[in-house]
Regions:
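Extracytoplasmic/secreted envelope proteins and their assembly/folding machinery
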Residues: 148-153, 187-190
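Assembly/oligomerization scaffold segments
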Residues: 1-143, 178-183, 187-198, 203-205, ...
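Intrinsically disordered, compositionally biased repeat/linker segments
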Residues: 221-267
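C-terminal extracytoplasmic interaction modules
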Residues: 101, 167-189, 195-196, 203-221, ...
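N-terminal export/assembly leaders
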Residues: 134-137, 152-182
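Extracellular beta-strand-rich, repetitive "passenger/adhesive" scaffolds
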Residues: 96-101, 154-159, 234
Length: 274
């Protein structure tokens, strides 16, 4: 979750103010630092793809890297001489508030994995620190048996990723022997730990690994109808009932108030995750 000011939240409720301003602080492999803004970043090219489950399915224990993509304006060959491969990026987005100031939000730390040069433009595909776990687990020197908590902590230490979640469900569960496979990576280990904990694994905007799950309490904030479950009764016995009324008197039937559009911020979380 990204904390923002009340003013930022208020601006997010205005339909005419969703013009986020991109910022990228790029540190090249040779130490050169480039600070890019909307003047250098191609319009509407700044995109972040995030997920807590595998594509096209619902998974427990997903450890999906967040991808940042943006295009740099290079019409005048300003950046042609720079090597962006492996560069580190601190990405931010800003929003202009009612008082004219700009509030900037840190949306993550990334590493350039696929730079492409097209003469007038340079496109950078970047992954967050979850990508640091993409190396062989055979390098681990951790002594087994080991608890899930110890396994996760050691994986973060070995891969240089700070850990935010130090305690979690089933964290004391002990694994008897070290998993052995030539294809096994630290990312696989992180995913396995998350699955046994009943969580997903993510990198937050500050670059820390955490285990989390979905907040279902938001669905109780308004007078919503519960659809129940596919129980064995016929007709289904669970869930709320609502009378649809009749076509003679359209005012007949049950009503349910789903709240206001402002209430929907809890579902979309547009101002929390960008």
């Amino acid at each position: 979750m990204i904390n923002v000011s009340t003013e930022f939240r208020n601006e997010m409720t205005q339909d005419d103010n969703r013009n986020f301003i991109p910022y990228a602080e790029i540190t090249l492999a040779d130490g050169t630092v480039l600070n890019l803004t909307e003047k250098e970043i191609w319009q509407e090219s700044f995109k972040i793809e995030d997920a807590t489950s595998a594509s096209g399915t619902f998974t427990i224990g997903a450890a999906v890297a967040t991808k940042l993509t943006f295009t740099i304006n290079n019409i005048y060959d300003t950046y042609s001489a720079y090597d962006f491969d492996g560069a580190s990026i601190a990405a931010r987005v800003g929003l202009t508030l009612a008082d004219g100031t700009t509030e900037k939000l840190l949306v993550g730390y990334y590493t350039v994995t696929e730079p492409s040069y097209d003469g007038t433009t340079i496109t950078l595909v970047c992954l967050d620190r979850m990508s640091k776990f993409n190396k062989a687990y055979s390098a681990s020197t951790l002594t087994y048996p080991a608890t899930l908590q110890t396994i996760l902590q050691q994986a973060c230490t070995d891969c240089g990723v700070p850990l935010l979640t130090t305690t979690f469900d089933n964290g004391s569960y002990s694994v008897a022997t070290k998993p052995e496979s030539d294809s096994l990576t630290y990312a696989d280990i992180v995913a396995c730990v998350a699955q046994i904990a009943g969580k997903f694994a993510k990198i937050d905007n500050n670059g820390y690994l955490y285990l989390g799950w979905y907040d279902f309490s938001i669905f109780e904030k308004n007078a919503n109808l519960d659809g129940g479950s596919f129980d064995s009764a016929s007709p289904y016995a669970t869930g709320d009932t609502a009378d649809g009324g009749n076509f003679t008197d359209y005012s007949s039937g049950a009503t349910a108030d789903g709240g206001t559009f402002y209430d929907q911020k809890y579902y979309h979380e547009c101002y929390l995750k960008v």
